[in-house]
């Protein structure tokens, strides 16, 4: 059985003072590392990545992400996986509210989407604003998040409003991890005294698509109770996203339905109130065949800090006293129930067409590790990046003085198309050696 395991963290809320001598949260982060070394390695066979469902930073500042990167590297080191094996989505704390508060244009764009009464009108307005090449108002507040996330290929833009990554299971199945953004509209009016929290916008373009032989794991910061137009979105999400991971609420629960496994994660760094209890999770996913139907098996291991705050242990209140929660989803039966009225030969045509517009798909047949190549490239200096791209004729000397992050990403895509990624990586490693 080809099992895939993941470590799931949420709401870490790194601040600039994290790891300072007076940082009282450092001990609990170290306790997570110890729990992974002693208990996770004993229970999990094949850790494929680290999943982070938002609020990586506290204020969306670059210094906070540098600290986050160092910690996530430590988590990866426990399982001897690459530092690029991190998958993340932004939360409301990953939005730099100073950027929003200082720009009437951003605030106006957010409110223009927020005030729409139907999801179709909201989607139309959203599309209008993200198509503005002069000033992309709805992405500007997460510039620092994108600088951090680009090394994992989890950055988002008008050209890629969600990301996805494929893993291989048995029974001719792939596990597709999809990361969507629920924080486009986040601003100072999210939480106002005496008012209900503002609802967040998730457009129809972020709903995962159907595809043959694919099981979907969805990552999103805000859970469905925080969504605008939930009644329009959630039924389709439930049909298409078999496993769903959420953060934001800082309270942990697992919802098991016949056709879904949904994890509402607690926070690694919750606010220190009377019910303060840090939590995180392990997840194992595998597949099998029964009666010629393919079954997706999901195991969730909820973890929480012990009462004496000394270490992490089984979250028995969430797992009903067991080591983990186990659930099986009959994928073939679920897909048939959702789609049986459609002709087999055209079953996924429309959705696959939508997917190709903004995919980040791992091509398992390729002999190179694209994620590591891109991660390493973003670890070298801006000057070295420009030098390499110029040497490989991926940019011109004339454009090198005008480069921004988007143009760098486009140059990397050209390296893919021109089959120059291996050469780019070789030059990247040479730069790293020169700078040691």
Language model features by range: what are they?
Residues 287-431:
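A short C-terminal boundary segment appended to hydrolase-like catalytic domains
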Residues 69-192:
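Extended active-site neighborhood of metal-dependent phosphoesterases/phosphodiesterases
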Residues 172, 224-298:
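Conserved beta-sheet core of the metallophosphoesterase superfamily
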Residues 21, 182-246, 254:
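Active-site-proximal segments of metal-dependent phosphoesterases and phosphodiesterases across multiple
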Residues 8-10, 48-55, 81-92, 216-225, ...:
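Active-site neighborhood of phospho(di)ester-bond hydrolases with catalytic His/Asp-centered motifs
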Residues 3-18, 174-186, 217-220, 262-267:
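Active-site-proximal beta-strand elements of phosphoester/diester hydrolases
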Residues 15-17, 57-60, 90-103, 187, ...:
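Active-site environment of divalent metal-dependent phosphoester hydrolases
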Residues 1-67, 71, 79-86, 96-98, ...:
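N-terminal active-site segment of His-dependent metallophosphoesterases
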């Amino acid at each position: 059985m080809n099992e895939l395991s993941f470590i799931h963290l949420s709401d870490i809320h790194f601040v600039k003072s994290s790891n300072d001598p007076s940082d009282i949260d450092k001990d609990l982060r170290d306790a997570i590392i110890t729990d992974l070394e002693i208990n996770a390695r004993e229970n999990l066979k094949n850790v494929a990545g680290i999943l982070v469902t938002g609020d990586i930073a506290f204020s969306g500042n670059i210094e906070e992400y540098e600290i986050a990167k160092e910690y996530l590297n430590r988590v990866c080191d426990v399982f001897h996986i690459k530092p690029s094996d991190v998958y993340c989505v932004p939360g409301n704390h990953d939005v730099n509210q100073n950027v929003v508060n200082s720009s009437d244009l951003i605030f106006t764009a957010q409110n223009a989407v927020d005030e729409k009464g139907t999801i179709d009108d909201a989607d139309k307005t959203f599309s209008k604003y993200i198509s503005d090449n002069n000033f992309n108002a709805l992405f500007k507040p997460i510039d620092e998040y994108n600088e951090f996330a680009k090394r994992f290929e989890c950055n988002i833009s008008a050209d890629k409003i969600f990301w996805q990554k494929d893993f291989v299971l048995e029974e001719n199945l792939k596990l597709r991890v999809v990361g969507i953004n629920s924080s486009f509209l986040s601003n100072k009016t999210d939480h106002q005294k005496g008012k209900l929290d503002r609802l967040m916008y998730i457009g129809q373009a972020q709903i995962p698509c159907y595809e043959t032989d694919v099981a979907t794991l969805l990552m999103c910061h805000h859970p469905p109770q925080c969504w605008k137009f939930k009644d329009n979105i959630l039924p389709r999400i439930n049909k298409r996203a078999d496993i769903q991971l959420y953060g934001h609420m800082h309270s942990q629960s697992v919802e098991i339905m016949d056709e879904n496994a949904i994890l509402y994660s607690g926070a690694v760094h919750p606010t220190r109130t009377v019910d303060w209890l840090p939590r995180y999770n392990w997840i194992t996913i595998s597949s099998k065949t029964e009666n010629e139907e393919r079954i997706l098996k999901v195991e969730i291991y909820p973890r929480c800090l012990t009462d004496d705050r000394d270490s992490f242990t089984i979250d028995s209140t969430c797992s009903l006293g067991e080591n983990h929660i186990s659930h099986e989803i009959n994928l073939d039966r679920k897909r048939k129930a959702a789609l049986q009225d459609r002709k087999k030969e055209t079953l996924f045509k429309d959705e696959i067409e939508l997917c190709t517009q903004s995919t980040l798909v791992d091509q398992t047949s390729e002999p190179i590790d694209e994620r590591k190549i891109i991660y390493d490239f973003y670890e070298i200096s801006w000057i070295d990046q420009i030098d390499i791209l110029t040497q490989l004729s991926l940019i011109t000397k004339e454009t090198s003085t005008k480069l921004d992050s988007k143009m760098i990403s486009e140059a990397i895509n050209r390296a893919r198309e021109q089959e120059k990624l291996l050469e780019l990586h070789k030059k990247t490693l040479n730069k790293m050696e020169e700078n040691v």
